[in-house]
Design a protein with these regions (language model features):
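C-terminal/domain-terminus segments
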Residues: 36-40, 46-54, 172-180, 207-232
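Short, basic/hydrophobic alpha-helical segments
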Residues: 1-21, 228
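C-terminal domain-tail junction helix/linker
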Residues: 124-125, 140-143, 164, 183-186, ...
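A short acidic (Asp/Glu
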Residues: 26-36
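Short amphipathic alpha-helical "interface-anchor" segments enriched in bulky aromatics
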Residues: 145-176
Length: 238
């Protein structure tokens, strides 16, 4: 992990501001804070943990969303002059102020108002809070924190390879799971992941009006244009 974040440190050298929204992992925290230490101190890098309830059923997610909406509406009724974004900002600021320090690292978790179906009970912890931001700026940074892009990437990988699909649960089999398409030789999974990684970074171009232009390799300056599979297989330069 440290090598990965060190590589990112070099790639992001010309980037003005860097924000990391990380899954809750102590190794990832240490690697990120170590590799970007100077930029964190200099005020050009921030890191946040993002935590969501991953094991809820659809009905449970809907119930939690209804509860969160009711709480939001009650809070909004005390601030009739604000629109939804203004109420959300005020609510986050209040929750930041009342957050309690937890654990040996004194993490202060803040539950976000109006979480979506994809991120139920979303909570955010600012890992690099040096007291440099005003309350409004800090609240909007909390509001931006999300793992949605990461989850979308994982789902895309699962759809591309049957080996990586989620296991199937059966009520008739006492809740046991069945990995229908699992590889008999685990090393095959690593090979598939390498192929998907190359295609994602160099070949597949995002679609849609809001999609970023080019491939990740093009946006990072590692390639001049999207490649084809033939370019990669036969080592053609771009």
């Amino acid at each position: 992990l440290h090598g990965y974040f060190t590589a990112l440190r070099k790639m992001f050298a010309s980037v003005g501001k860097v924000r990391f929204f990380l899954d809750q992992d102590s190794g990832m925290r240490g690697a990120c804070l170590s590799a970007f230490r100077d930029r964190i101190i200099g005020g050009t890098c921030d890191a946040f943990f993002v935590r969501i309830a991953k094991d809820l059923t659809i009905d449970e997610k809907r119930r939690r969303m209804r509860d969160a909406k009711a709480e939001f509406d009650l809070y909004a009724s005390t601030m009739p002059g604000l629109d939804e974004d203004g109420v959300r900002l005020a609510m986050i600021k209040d929750r930041i102020q009342s957050a309690q320090s937890i654990g040996p690292w004194k993490d202060r978790w803040v539950f976000m108002p109006l979480p979506g179906m994809s991120e139920p009970e979303k909570a955010v912890c600012h890992l690099t809070d040096l007291g440099r931001y005003d309350p409004d700026h800090l609240a909007w940074l909390y509001n931006k924190a999300s793992l949605h892009a990461v989850d979308s990437f994982f789902n895309r990988i699962r759809r591309r390879s049957s080996m990586l699909e989620r296991p199937v649960s059966s009520s008739a089999n006492r809740g046991r799971v069945w990995n229908q398409s699992s590889a008999y030789r685990p090393e095959q999974v690593a090979k598939i992941q390498n192929i998907i990684r190359a295609c994602h970074n160099y070949v597949w171009v995002p679609e849609g009006k809001k999609a970023e232009r080019g491939t990740p390799a093009v946006r990072l300056g590692l390639a001049k244009a999207p490649l084809t599979l033939e370019d990669i297989i036969y080592f053609k330069s771009s």
